[in-house]
Amino acid sequence: MEKMEKVEFIDVKVVPYRLLNPQTVETILNKIYDLDGIVRVLVHGPSIPKEIPYGPAKGIKVNHKDRQVIKVKGEEVELKVKVGEIIVGVLCDDKMDENIGKIEKIMDENLPCSYQMWVGTYTKRDVTVTDWMKYGPKFEKKLDPRYIGLVDPNSKVKENVKLIK
């Protein structure tokens, strides 16, 4: 098996004490993507379904005010979660500490509540059997390394991952 180019980065995990509204998420993501050395950004939180998935009301549309389309660097991104956690991948280079400080400043200026921030490894870095199941054999040459660890093998990538350049 041939090795794909490895991207060395560290994760900065930000957990606000409250779930964030779409406008706050849009502002924060745009400011983070303005920084140099950002590899990827993941948002995580409770799902906001389009329809009720099970039970007696199964199939009925859910009209949730926070399931919105936001613009991040000119790209439209549909928020499918109520954001409660942001993980930012920062390149391990000479600007890493500076970028971590800038991320902290962005959070201080834009979050309406207190938060906790940790630096460490919170996402997968290496190809696993799950990735092989999802993408098939010999995918290493074709796959952007930023996809590693982002998608459940049973989900559709384009429904759950949005690459912002």
Curated annotation (Swiss-Prot):
Key word Transmembrane helix present: no
UniProt xrefs under InterPro entries: Me_CoM_Rdtase_D
Keywords tagged on the record: Methanogenesis
Single GO biological process annotation from the record: methanogenesis
Pfam families tied to this protein: MCR_D
Subunit organization: MCR is composed of three subunits: alpha, beta, and gamma. The function of protein D is not known.
NCBIfam families: met_CoM_red_D (TIGR03260)
Name of the protein described by the UniProt record: Methyl-coenzyme M reductase II operon protein D
Organism: Methanothermus fervidus (strain ATCC 43054 / DSM 2088 / JCM 10308 / V24 S)
